[in-house]
């Protein structure tokens, strides 16, 4: 059904040929699409702050948690052990973790689309992934494509930030496994390189698509 939906969506939009960009969860979908369905007409793929393995992702998040204060580490460990993700100490620790590695509070100078209030799909996030970035216990807990990455034949641009949830190890895993790939690491960027270094990000995409068009 998923393959039929993707083919029909592309047909409806007239996307016979395209450059496929997947950011975060979108990158996971892109990897699944290329590995399992082997579609035609994909000129290149941009895998932006994404991952090929829920297990690897969780491992790297827990590694970064070790750089937090002992108080925050204990609060997170307690929440994972008890399953109580409503404790104020945990919520504060998780907020600090996300501030370090996901994104900051929008500034007054940021575009309106970033500043306006958002409706966050908490239920769908928990169902698909879990209560946070480092506890994948949802439907995607068994997402594992590391051994299939070698089957991606399209040119692949891998992007992540030095402070990203998508750590350099996660990005390097994709780079090492995808035959025709290029890796660009953004200094001092978190999970939203396109926000925190917009000019470089857009220049890179334009250059990449021109080279692979």
Task: Place the predicted regions along the sequence by residue.
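Active-site acidic short loop of glycosyltransferases
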Residues: 11-17, 39, 153-154, 180
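Conserved hydrolase catalytic core segment
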Residues: 16-60
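Short aromatic-enriched loop/helix-cap "lid" or pocket-rim segments at secondary-structure transitions
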Residues: 56-61, 171, 196-198
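Alpha/beta-hydrolase
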Residues: 66-154
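Conserved loop-alpha-helix segment in the C-terminal half of the alpha/beta-hydrolase fold
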Residues: 146-189
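Catalytic active-site module of serine/aspartate enzymes centered on a nucleophile-bearing elbow/loop
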Residues: 181-213
């Amino acid at each position: 059904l998923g393959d039929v939906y993707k083919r029909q969506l592309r047909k409806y939009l007239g996307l016979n040929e395209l450059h496929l960009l997947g950011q975060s969860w979108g990158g996971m979908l892109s990897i699944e699409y290329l590995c399992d369905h082997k579609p035609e007409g994909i000129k290149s793929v941009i895998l932006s702050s994404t991952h090929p393995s829920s297990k690897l992702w969780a491992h790297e998040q827990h590694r970064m948690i070790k750089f937090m204060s002992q108080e925050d580490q204990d609060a997170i460990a307690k929440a994972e052990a008890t399953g109580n993700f409503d404790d104020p100490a945990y919520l504060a620790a998780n907020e600090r973790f996300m501030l370090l590695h996901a994104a900051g509070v929008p500034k007054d100078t940021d575009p309106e689309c970033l500043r306006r209030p958002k409706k966050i799909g908490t239920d769908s996030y928990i169902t698909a992934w879990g209560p946070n970035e480092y506890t994948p216990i949802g439907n995607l807990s068994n997402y594992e494509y590391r051994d299939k990455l070698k089957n991606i034949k399209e040119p692949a641009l891998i992007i992540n930030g030095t402070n990203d949830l998508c750590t350099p190890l996660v990005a390097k895993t994709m780079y090492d496994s995808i035959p025709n790939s290029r890796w660009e690491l953004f200094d001092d960027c978190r999970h939203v390189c396109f926000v925190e270094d917009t000019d470089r990000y857009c220049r890179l995409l334009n250059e990449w698509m021109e080279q692979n068009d």
